[in-house]
């Protein structure tokens, strides 16, 4: 339904133009103009203030390093595109569970091919955007940068078969380690720990290829989605599982062996930073724990510093661990002796 505003040359304002149009009276039109003028005057009344604030916000003094300017119009990495990369990787790694839900034996290769093609395109664009961000747009040959990005994206896609094999061990470990899990299908569909591990393995592979910024964006999307924070720089073996998962933190230089299981709230972190002569934290040094094979760490335990947790060790919940743990050792919290039990009448 539309409104017809009559031309000033038409004397009869009650004239209908069609069955579905209504005439606005001159009095109503005048009221609209008055409202518009009032709103415009309120804006103009503060125009000087807005201009002054805009000048301050755009000044180099205010911006400092909080602004990224592209001289050639190159785009920066986009959150929506990074999410699409994750979705495409999941669809390729777990066809039918993610992405197209009508995959069958006859169209499986077709759907994987379509998703791989789309993945290469989007990933190439985002890798190039990440390189631009890292170079602060100083590159003079953007076409060469795009070619390098396309090559890197192809190298990543070549890593997907091995990544799927490793993820299969993670799914199996998660299923076998949780008596509440009904099937591996349930693990793939539902478990936040596995989703975080998938994102980690994608991000870690990209990081090993030298891709800037994108790996961290992928891991932080998993952090937001699951509450599990795994830095893409961590090294994690096969048959890895995270049960429940909320609050798990794995630092950038952590090394985790095979068949390791973490429960919710576990932190594999650093004790403190070393500082240089200017009192700035020294980055890039190993500062997180090394976890051996077949280790279980229960909920809300913090393992801090570059310490070694031996093979087959079991660490109980709510413990602060800052020293090495030997092979086959079990750490538990001392039994509380200050519990008051009240008898009910």
Where does each model-flagged region fall?
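Terminal amphipathic alpha-helical/low-complexity segments used for targeting or macromolecular assembly
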Residues: 2-13, 24-217
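Structural signal for interior beta-strand "rungs" in well-ordered beta-sheet cores
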Residues: 222-344
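Short coil/turn motifs at helix boundaries and re-entrant loops, enriched in small/polar
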Residues: 16
